Every structure is written in structure tokens, then in C-alpha cells.
Amino acid sequence: MSNMMKALVKSKAEVGLWMEDVPVPEVGPNDVLIRVKKSAICGTDVHIWNWDQWAQKTIPVPMVVGHEFSGEIAEIGSAVTRYHVGERVSGEGHIVCGKCRNCRAGRGHLCRNTLGVGVNRPGSFGEFVCIPESNVVPIPDDISDEIAAIFDPFGNAVHTALSFDLVGEDVLVTGAGPIGIMGALVAKRSGARKVVITDINPHRLDLARKLGIDHVVDASKENLADVMKAIGMTEGFDVGLEMSGAAPAFRDMIDKMNNGGKIAILGIAPAGFEIDWNKVIFKMLNLKGIYGREMFETWYKMIAFVQGGLDLSPIITHRIKIDDFRDGFEAMRSGNSGKVVMDWM
């Protein structure tokens, strides 16, 4: 195996990513080197491409980025015992310290020292990625490489949707991006009574309909209260999944929640936006922030959803060769795409 590889690198502090030859990552005793077959583009990668304020404060330059992937094990460290070369895998992109109180209590997803693959350390937009053995997730034979490549965002959706009991509940999802749509699908499959999803992007609304979401609302044209009445809702929503990061959507969600309602918040909102805290208080709402996936319970659950028949393939709207990565990022930046999966093989 060559000691060099192709990779997408944030090599300059400006807009874009660049395909370069870089060294293959070194494998430590507890590490696993994975040959990447499929990579998916995340919204985080778009922020890095755009070199916005968050990216400028967060991303070291130069660095290989990317964190949504699937592949097969190419090499294992001397102390690795659970995996073997050739095994099909994906990986948890949040690397935790294992030493803080939350980690020691089995709550690794709450680690205050979390490092993100492709954000704080070299990522998976390369022919190889190296992660700790503890972050490797085997992929069953009946799950394809491209579906495994979107398990990271699907895990965000599963973690958010399953934060609260859904059986018999009326659920509002704000934001019909890929994660919002997947969250709505999980809610529907988990026994929710009514599932309503809102957005203002026509392409994303059409994609939600294509995936089988029953009640799809264009918030720029339709009044949510009228939709609730039309579908037989006489009280507010029991559970809210905020996936948009849009202040107007979050405010509308709070307004439409039933007393005692529960809201899981994944969307990253602009700093300093206002909500009516009196509604939160007097409706006795429960707000829960979500970041990433529960390690590793969410992975077991999402594998079970897919093996149980949940078809995520329509959420992948663009399949491209890695040399055409600019086309993939153009599609993502336009807002007129679902997931974009890039083929390294």
C-alpha cells in the first residue's frame, strides 16, 4: 500500500476544498485504518467549504475534512482485538475522552472534551481515514455502503426523534432537510399519531412527500393552525423536533405545542434570536438540546430501523464520483438536494 492518498483538504483559509495528495494516516496501537468507499456531504462540510464565521473559528488549516463515510478495514493497530482486515464498517465521528464524569458514567455523547472527525482532527474525505477501535461500527451484510455512509446524519435524526415517547403522539417537525425528513420517518415508524413537517423550500417539501410523510406544510404559504384543524387536531402538538435552525420555525413550534409538550432541538439557530419564554413557562414545555448520537445506543437503533424495512435510499438524490466533488458541493449549497454520496472506488 502506498504511503500517500488522495484527499479533499481545507488547505487555504478561503472558500472551497482542494483535492491533494497527502500522507496516509499513521495507525496507532488502538486505531483502525479504514479504506473509504463512500463519503456523504454534511451541512457542516458546506460550512467548511463556505469558510463562514463558524468554520474560521473552528477548523484548523490545512486539514482533511469530512465525517460521513463507509468502507472496509485496511489495517488494524497492534492492540486491536475486535475487528479484522476486510470487515465492512462505518464509524462514530465524535471521539470522546473516556475520562470525564459523563464518559465514566457511560454517557459518552455528553463528553465535554469531544473531538469531531473532519472538524477538530483529520476526516474521512480521503482514500483512508483512521479512527480509534472504540469508534468503529460494523455494517451488516444486508445494509449497503451508501446507506451506511449516511448513518451519521440518520443517527442525528434517530437520536432527536427518540428523545421522547412517540406512541400515539402528534409530532411537529420543523425543517425538511434530509435529517428532518429522516426524523419524521422515524416518528411515523415509531407509532406517532400525526406527523407534520414544515419548510419553505419547494424541493425539500417535494422530497418529504416522495418519502411518504403524510402532512407536508409549506410554511411560506400555509397557516399551520389551519392545517392542524384540517387533519383533526383539537389540541397542540405533543412532541416537536426542531431541525431547521430557523428562528421563525422555532417560534411557530412553541406557539403550536400542547401544554406539557416536549421539544428536541437539533437545528443550530442564529445567536441571540428571541422566543416568547412566557409560552415556554406557562405551557410547561420541556426543551432538550441534541448533539450527535448516543454512543452507541443510537447506532443499534438505526441499524434496526433499516433492517426492519425503513428505506432511506430516496433521501440520496445525488450519487457522484469523487473527482466530481465540486458538483456535489454545488448541489448541497443550492439547497435543492437531499443527501449527496461520493464514490471513492
From Swiss-Prot:
Binding locations of NAD(+): 179, 199, 204, 266-268, 290-291
Residues holding Zn(2+) 2: 97, 100, 103, 111
Annotated binding of Zn(2+) 1, by residue: 42, 67-68
Active site: 44, 47
Keyword Amino-acid biosynthesis in record: no
Function of the molecule: Catalyzes the NAD(+)-dependent oxidation of L-threonine to 2-amino-3-ketobutyrate.
Subunit annotation: Homotetramer.
Name of the protein described by the UniProt record: L-threonine 3-dehydrogenase
Source organism of the structure: Rhizobium etli (strain CIAT 652)
